């Protein structure tokens, strides 16, 4: 406990004197932090400072000392970070802070939309209490009818629990709607390699800063072009964060079995109607979740994923 109190104390420590300004950490390479002056709109080199973290702010072997997304105060002359402001939230994977939305991006063609990976991403976002949005890319490669079938399937299984934005970078479709929704926010763009994250960010920032890649014909998957998380400022108060692509994703780590139900928004209106307060919605009698599953108020895919998640998360703690 005293270690945590010491950490909180030194994380808010400030200095007198010096040429101090406030900024956001947009990149980290080894022991260097790249800080964007908060008063600057663009990511020009002269607005970014390569800084080290002041020694008294370091806790040995602690990756959370200072992470991408942190709001910091730094001495622009000495290039030293002297204060890290309190975070409103942070993600463990990738390690980021102060996020408003998790943008989950999947292609409607290749790589194939993986509903299991998508739902794992929703679980991880929900555990950190960060709202998620679904971005469907490459919609110009399918017909309007095929897109509608896709949207209907998402609606059928997830209802109104997640906003959906169909987009095409090539045809400039849906980008204005997406940009309007995320205006003034810090949004991660996460998804499998090859889904179009880099192309989307390049379009929004108006430069080909990020390398894009092609889909492997053999695996129908993309090759990783992003190896680290990076912040990009697309206007005065809107950030996109490019994150490394992936093909698999871990389940969140939960301590209590009852925590899992809270990560399924469609369960919320039925949980308190269960006969037993400790109902886990598996084999218990009088389970309102199972009753509403039979009525069609909860999708079979979502309930099966709940069981699958429960088995994987608590397999060693039954």
Where do the protein language model's features map onto the residues?
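Helix-rich effector regions associated with P-loop NTPase G domains
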Residues: 2-10, 15-19, 31, 38, ...
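Short, acidic/hydrophobic/Gly-rich beta-strand patch recurrent on exposed beta strands
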Residues: 34-39, 50-52
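Beta-strand/loop nucleic-acid-binding surfaces
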Residues: 44-65
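Short, charged beta-turn/beta-strand-edge "cap" motif at the junction between a beta-strand
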Residues: 76-80, 108-109
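Phosphate-binding glycine-rich loops and their immediate beta-loop-alpha structural context
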Residues: 109-157
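Canonical P-loop GTPase G-domain recognition
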Residues: 141-195
